[in-house]
């Protein structure tokens, strides 16, 4: 991993802006991992006029899944539900194909730059994958 990226990750992990108590959030979901992973996060979402106005998380996970939660929520704050779905789909497609076809917001770009090996991919995708599915279900 590039030294600059490592320094950014450490700085973000040392000052998680979205890790908080979730009692004030109207909508909450819990991420689900596979049987080989004990990481879990509760995600809190606030909407106003179809826009994500506040996001938060709490729970336990490795540094990769924690940073992925923080950066995913950072990238989606202020977006409409439709915009959030499109961004998450673009990110998931890039990770699955190994190719970035469209520019990503800075926070998701940093996740892309992680260069995670296959063994840790579940950690990276825990929050983006679960949040994408929840937003799709919520919007229908």
Curated annotation (Swiss-Prot):
* Gene3D superfamilies referenced in this protein's UniProt entry, alphabetically: 3.90.1010.10
Protein name per its UniProtKB record: Uncharacterized protein MG337 homolog
Q: Which GO terms describe its biological process?
A: iron-sulfur cluster assembly
Among InterPro entries, the record links this protein to: NIF_FeS_clus_asmbl_NifU_N
To which species is this protein native?
Answer: Mycoplasma pneumoniae (strain ATCC 29342 / M129 / Subtype 1) (Mycoplasmoides pneumoniae)
Kindly list the cysteine pairs connected by disulfide bridges: none
GO molecular function ontology, one term from the record: iron ion binding
Q: Name one Pfam family in it.
A: NifU_N
